[in-house]
Amino acid sequence: MKFDVCVPILGFENVKEVTLEKIDDAFMRMESSNDEHISFTLINPFALREYDFEIPDATQKLLEIDEKSNILILNIAIIQTPVEDTVVNFIGPMIFNTDNNKAAQLVLSESTKYGVAEKISLYLKK
């Protein structure tokens, strides 16, 4: 599924359109539509932990989100070997409106509540 990026991805401001592809129930791959060398592994944060935040009104307007919108929230993960060393960016979620194919990266102000590089091993069941 293709998405127009309405709010730039930090460090990748030239990425204007991405494709999203499901890997499994927890992971997805996001790739730039115009540069195959730019891709990210995304994870469903709700598969790992409790995760909540408010989407600012300005972002809701850009993505045309209302109470009936179908949205998908994913976080960028840096996959490591072993997988327990994988880190997740919880303060920069990607927001996807699947009704109109618009996306944005949000930088949360609650940075003390979530980390930029939290080890996935903190949330895996042992």
UniProtKB/Swiss-Prot annotation:
InterPro entries xrefs: Flagellar_assembly_factor_FliW, Flagellar_assmbl_FliW_dom_sf
Keyword Cell cycle attached: no
Chief site of localization: cytoplasm
Any one GO biological process: bacterial-type flagellum assembly
TM stretches of this protein: none
Keyword annotations of the record: Bacterial flagellum biogenesis, Chaperone, Cytoplasm, Translation regulation
Entry's localization field: Cytoplasm
Domain of life: Bacteria
Keyword Nuclease assigned: no
Recorded GO CC terms: cytoplasm
Record family assignment: Belongs to the FliW family.
Protein role: Acts as an anti-CsrA protein, binds CsrA and prevents it from repressing translation of its target genes, one of which is flagellin. Binds to flagellin and participates in the assembly of the flagellum.
Subunit structure: Interacts with translational regulator CsrA and flagellin(s).
Protein name: Flagellar assembly factor FliW
Organism: Sulfurimonas denitrificans (strain ATCC 33889 / DSM 1251) (Thiomicrospira denitrificans (strain ATCC 33889 / DSM 1251))
